[in-house]
Amino acid sequence: MEVTCLLLLALIPFHCRGQGVYAPAQAQIVHAGQACVVKEDNISERVYTIRESDTLVLQCLVTGHPRPQVRWTKTAGSASDKFQETSVFNETLRIERIARTQGGRYYCKAENGVGVPAIKSIRVDVQYLDEPVLTVHQTVSDVRGNFYQEKTVFLRCTVSSNPPARFIWKRGSDTLSHSQDNGVDIYEPLYTQGETKVLKLKNLRPQDYASYTCQVSVRNVCGIPDKAITFQLTNTTAPPALKLSVNETLVVNPGENVTVQCLLTGGDPLPQLHWSHGPGPLPLGALAQGGTLSIPSVQARDSGYYNCTATNNVGNPAKKTVNLLVRSLKNATFQITPDMIKESENIQLGQDLKLSCHVDAVPQEKVNYQWFKNGKPARTSKRLLVTRNDPELPAVTSSLELIDLHFSDYGTYLCMASFPGSPVPDLSIEVNISSETVPPTISVPKGRAVVTVREGSPAELQCEVRGKPRPPVLWSRVDKEAALLPSGLALEETPDGKLRLESVSRDMSGTYRCQTARYNGFNVRPREAQVQLTVHFPPEVEPSSQDVRQALGRPVLLRCSLLRGSPQRIASAVWRFKGQLLPPPPVLPAAAVETPDHAELRLDALTRDSSGNYECSVSNDVGSATCLFQVSAKAYSPEFYFDTPNPTRSHKLSKNYSYVLQWTQREPDAVDPVLNYRLSIRQLNQHNAMVKAIPVRRVEKGQLLEYILTDLRVPHSYEIRLTPYTTFGAGDMASRIIHYTEPINLPSLSDNTCHFEDEKICGYTQDLTDNFDWTRQNALTQNPKRSPNTGPPTDISGTPEGYYMFIETSRPRELGDRARLVSPLYNASAKFYCVSFFYHMYGKHIGSLNLLVRSRNKGTLDTHAWSLSGNKGNVWQQAHVPINPSGPFQIIFEGVRGSGYLGDIAIDDVTLKKGECPRRQMDPNKVVVMPGSGAPRLSSLQLWGSMAIFLLALQR
């Protein structure tokens, strides 16, 4: 019955079978890149090892229907400093020149909406070996009461690698081992992870002054070669020592040229010098040459720490730092502090008053303050005190304190900051003290408490400050914790009380606080007010686009909903059909007025004329947004079934193949029933397509439909387009590319022929113990300079696209060289098998073609089953070889090179089947006649008659 079903499947071009083939996604990860090794640590742990800078290729093989969508994600590995995720929506993940930080666990997530998603993972281990670093440390200790000293040297070798490196220490060319003698010790320091090894030379002896090599190895994993570093230890080896040509703190005036020299005072080997600057890089124009640093025309922005570092891998690096200070004065501010003891916030006669002055200076401690009253220097007295460092204010702040304020103390006070003897200009600020000097108040102008603007427009928030003097206004946000102002600052100063915002966005909406500053005015509790900013923006609706399918004659309801907007309401809704304005929907009773958050349109019955694009434009008086509906009775696209087992079926003695195309119909009940499908078949790289109509009966959801594509040419690929048709007309088209793939040549009840058209060559492999390999080629890939008068011009089919396997016997091949092509391993399930194949042996130097059977029952044993030698003419001939393996076996085609270069041998169309070979062998000298060459064929009626008789015999 199984054979009957298979034959019926082949005879009937189309049929429907099965229900509910929808299946959840299944996934499996395989590698296809430059992997060193893939280890299976346990059932759930797979490790993919790859060398750094190689190409990572992972494939997620999926099954399930509909075809699952694949997404790759990654979590951080050991070399990554933080969690990271990358998404790749493709079945193949490819990373060129992979870096160590890209190691980690990769997840393949496959989902198709049926059941739960399938998630598989694999850990990618990136292997690398950096250059080792060797440092030398020396210690000297007193022994036996200072009678003599012991000198101990530590050679520390560090390397970054994965996997952990193996360390080999050498003195000269001799390898050192742990405790080799009393003077040598090798150990791993504490708190290291295998990346460091120390060679300790105790009580240094004359023979210890030598060349030492640290060789690191990862045991050639991934082909990574060993690396080494060498150090020459002498009795003059010493760490670096430095001194500077200037003081550690260097104060200069702006515009001067600065030169600092870093001088070596010791070190063997000769140390390397390096200049750096913090924070940031060296200034533009700065020149570091050896130990000399030059900065022309220095400016205030060039202030900072300049570091000179000397290294020679002996001891610790030597470092000297110069703190460069470029004199500058900026940001002069003052404060008026009423009598703090009496907690007063106003200036009153008879109470104390303090005026403070501060300037941001470099160097801060060198600034000099002077106070003036009404243009004359202020003189200290019992009632007028001047302090340089007020402990209640920022460092180096000068204060002038008036005790028991009198009317005569009113006037204009000026604070001047300077660097005596420096060309830096003085900086001054003045404050007027009078009966009109009052603390500030702040308020929001009338009508400005709420500011409403459209998104993208400028906005201005304003607070008015009254008082004398008027301090700056500081702005901040209130309603959002830790929120920053549009400028990126948490607090922004405005001199006129106006906060100007350019091109506001919706996230700028909220409450803003304005408050008085405690500088350049009264040093009292800040006064504050609030301004509300409202940003209006156009509405956002859903769905922005929706595909609505419905059968003809059924009602349709279209709804456009408001998601967000400011204001959050629908002011108007306008419907259009194919660009034409529709009349407003009928007015509903007051109790059923449509809610303000959506708009609806009802179609009583869908017709061909009412199918098309509908637009709903929703407005909130600020802007509008559109819902787009594509309404039709079109059928959804077919869903190709990709899990068909062995969809490709090749035909013996021809270069045609058939393909089993299977699919389901997506949501068949959503529209009118599918009447037929239109199938378009186009060979890739060609323009013409063949179109067929496939009638069907009522299609159920999940029902698997099938059609066998015949007369496809090996090894071409085809584009398949499938379109469903209903009473409405053509539905959505689905397309896919089908490729010819040869199955692994497993013996079965039916003949299974390998044409070598696929790169996988049916699972055949090249033997690793022979002298050279078989080559797969066709007439299009032949070497134009190949030897004439040998080898076939085409394969057995006579088409230029057809492939075959052959041995090239030109140089450097020699007499007796062997090439072996080994089949997959077969499990013997029958007593007899027959191996059929075509061979081509043409040329005066033809050697031998042998067929061997490799038995793997008890060990490995190769047995000769067939052999042929010499020139057999420029024709393809067929051989049938019976074999009777006793257990699992492989067949081997062995080509042996003859006495010269005119000895190419080819094979094609290898078939392995159960049972005995045909008793009547084909004449080995008879040319095989291919289809289309004029050979007689059975008519279709004769074929049907023979098949019918065969089916009746099977049923009996």
From Swiss-Prot:
<dbReference type="GO" id="GO:1905606">
    <property type="term" value="P:regulation of presynapse assembly"/>
</dbReference>
<dbReference type="InterPro" id="IPR000998">
    <property type="entry name" value="MAM_dom"/>
</dbReference>
<feature type="glycosylation site" description="N-linked (GlcNAc...) asparagine">
    <location>
        <position position="432"/>
    </location>
</feature>
<keyword id="KW-0393">Immunoglobulin domain</keyword>
<keyword id="KW-0336">GPI-anchor</keyword>
<feature type="domain" description="Ig-like 5">
    <location>
        <begin position="440"/>
        <end position="532"/>
    </location>
</feature>
<keyword id="KW-0677">Repeat</keyword>
<feature type="glycosylation site" description="N-linked (GlcNAc...) asparagine">
    <location>
        <position position="307"/>
    </location>
</feature>
<dbReference type="InterPro" id="IPR050958">
    <property type="entry name" value="Cell_Adh-Cytoskel_Orgn"/>
</dbReference>
<comment type="function">
    <text>Required for radial migration of cortical neurons in the superficial layer of the neocortex. Plays a role in the formation or maintenance of inhibitory synapses. May function by inhibiting the activity of NLGN2.</text>
</comment>
<keyword id="KW-1015">Disulfide bond</keyword>
<dbReference type="InterPro" id="IPR013320">
    <property type="entry name" value="ConA-like_dom_sf"/>
</dbReference>
<feature type="disulfide bond">
    <location>
        <begin position="560"/>
        <end position="616"/>
    </location>
</feature>
<dbReference type="GO" id="GO:0001764">
    <property type="term" value="P:neuron migration"/>
</dbReference>
<dbReference type="GO" id="GO:0042417">
    <property type="term" value="P:dopamine metabolic process"/>
</dbReference>
<dbReference type="InterPro" id="IPR007110">
    <property type="entry name" value="Ig-like_dom"/>
</dbReference>
<feature type="disulfide bond">
    <location>
        <begin position="262"/>
        <end position="308"/>
    </location>
</feature>
<feature type="domain" description="Ig-like 2">
    <location>
        <begin position="132"/>
        <end position="230"/>
    </location>
</feature>
<dbReference type="InterPro" id="IPR003599">
    <property type="entry name" value="Ig_sub"/>
</dbReference>
<feature type="region of interest" description="Disordered">
    <location>
        <begin position="780"/>
        <end position="799"/>
    </location>
</feature>
<feature type="glycosylation site" description="N-linked (GlcNAc...) asparagine">
    <location>
        <position position="42"/>
    </location>
</feature>
<feature type="propeptide" description="Removed in mature form">
    <location>
        <begin position="934"/>
        <end position="956"/>
    </location>
</feature>
<dbReference type="GO" id="GO:0045121">
    <property type="term" value="C:membrane raft"/>
</dbReference>
<feature type="signal peptide">
    <location>
        <begin position="1"/>
        <end position="18"/>
    </location>
</feature>
<feature type="compositionally biased region" description="Polar residues">
    <location>
        <begin position="780"/>
        <end position="789"/>
    </location>
</feature>
<feature type="glycosylation site" description="N-linked (GlcNAc...) asparagine">
    <location>
        <position position="235"/>
    </location>
</feature>
<protein>
    <recommendedName>
        <fullName>MAM domain-containing glycosylphosphatidylinositol anchor protein 1</fullName>
    </recommendedName>
</protein>
<dbReference type="GO" id="GO:0042428">
    <property type="term" value="P:serotonin metabolic process"/>
</dbReference>
<feature type="disulfide bond">
    <location>
        <begin position="157"/>
        <end position="214"/>
    </location>
</feature>
<feature type="disulfide bond">
    <location>
        <begin position="357"/>
        <end position="415"/>
    </location>
</feature>
<dbReference type="InterPro" id="IPR013783">
    <property type="entry name" value="Ig-like_fold"/>
</dbReference>
<dbReference type="Pfam" id="PF00629">
    <property type="entry name" value="MAM"/>
</dbReference>
<keyword id="KW-0217">Developmental protein</keyword>
<dbReference type="InterPro" id="IPR036116">
    <property type="entry name" value="FN3_sf"/>
</dbReference>
<dbReference type="GO" id="GO:0098982">
    <property type="term" value="C:GABA-ergic synapse"/>
</dbReference>
<comment type="subunit">
    <text>Interacts heterophilically through its MAM domain with proteins in axon-rich regions and through its Ig-like domains with proteins in differentiating muscle. Interacts (through the Ig-like domains) with NLGN2.</text>
</comment>
<feature type="lipid moiety-binding region" description="GPI-anchor amidated serine">
    <location>
        <position position="933"/>
    </location>
</feature>
<feature type="domain" description="Fibronectin type-III">
    <location>
        <begin position="627"/>
        <end position="744"/>
    </location>
</feature>
<dbReference type="GO" id="GO:1904862">
    <property type="term" value="P:inhibitory synapse assembly"/>
</dbReference>
<feature type="glycosylation site" description="N-linked (GlcNAc...) asparagine">
    <location>
        <position position="257"/>
    </location>
</feature>
<dbReference type="InterPro" id="IPR003598">
    <property type="entry name" value="Ig_sub2"/>
</dbReference>
<dbReference type="GO" id="GO:0060134">
    <property type="term" value="P:prepulse inhibition"/>
</dbReference>
